[in-house]
Amino acid sequence: MLGTALRRCAVAAASRAGSRGLLHPTPVPGPTAAIQSIRCYSHGSHETDEEFDARWVTYFNKPDIDAWELRKGMNTLVGYDLVPEPKIIDAALRACRRLNDFASAVRILEVVKDKAGPHKEIYPYVIQELRPTLNELGISTPEELGLDKV
């Protein structure tokens, strides 16, 4: 659709140029109509918070997830302007456990602390919500490992 609209704009510009050439096109009123037709690309459906959470939980709960997909998913998730919900982090930690990747599990907890930024109440809340999972999976927090003092 975008390619077709761009071709139409190029053809229209070439026909407006006429005998004066492309360097000195004849001004024609109304070129914004052609441009506006290609600027409708941001009108997609918007994802609710619940759908967002469900999408990421499903992603990390894939039984055949590999280490690269885990890192890619976490990298993408960290790129968003939010602190992931505890249920998303829970699914990511369980994926780490399935892969026997303790380092990634600790790194995920470090990233959550970093994403919380100056809001000091967020990270303790997330750890409190994840405590049963951390105990079940045998994952230590960065503070328990002494990494917060480095």
Curated annotation (Swiss-Prot):
State any GO CC term. respiratory chain complex IV
Please give, as recorded in its UniProt entry, the membrane topology of this protein. Peripheral membrane protein
Q: Specify the protein name.
A: Cytochrome c oxidase subunit 5A, mitochondrial
Instruction: Give the GO terms filed under biological process for this record.
Output: mitochondrial electron transport, cytochrome c to oxygen
Q: Which residues carry this modification: N6-acetyllysine?
A: K87, K113
Instruction: Define the transit peptide region by residue numbers.
Output: 1-41
Q: What does this protein do?
A: Component of the cytochrome c oxidase, the last enzyme in the mitochondrial electron transport chain which drives oxidative phosphorylation. The respiratory chain contains 3 multisubunit complexes succinate dehydrogenase (complex II, CII), ubiquinol-cytochrome c oxidoreductase (cytochrome b-c1 complex, complex III, CIII) and cytochrome c oxidase (complex IV, CIV), that cooperate to transfer electrons derived from NADH and succinate to molecular oxygen, creating an electrochemical gradient over the inner membrane that drives transmembrane transport and the ATP synthase.
Assembly and partners are described as:
Component of the cytochrome c oxidase (complex IV, CIV), a multisubunit enzyme composed of 14 subunits. The complex is composed of a catalytic core of 3 subunits MT-CO1, MT-CO2 and MT-CO3, encoded in the mitochondrial DNA, and 11 supernumerary subunits COX4I, COX5A, COX5B, COX6A, COX6B, COX6C, COX7A, COX7B, COX7C, COX8 and NDUFA4, which are encoded in the nuclear genome.
InterPro entries (UniProt xref) = Cyt_c_oxidase_su5A/6 (IPR003204), Cyt_c_oxidase_su5A/6_sf (IPR036545)
Q: In which pathway does it act?
A: Energy metabolism; oxidative phosphorylation
Q: What is the lineage of its organism?
A: Eukaryota, Metazoa, Chordata, Craniata, Vertebrata
> Pfam families from the xrefs?
COX5A
- Its transmembrane ranges are none
For the motif SIFI-degron, what are the positions?
Answer: 2-17
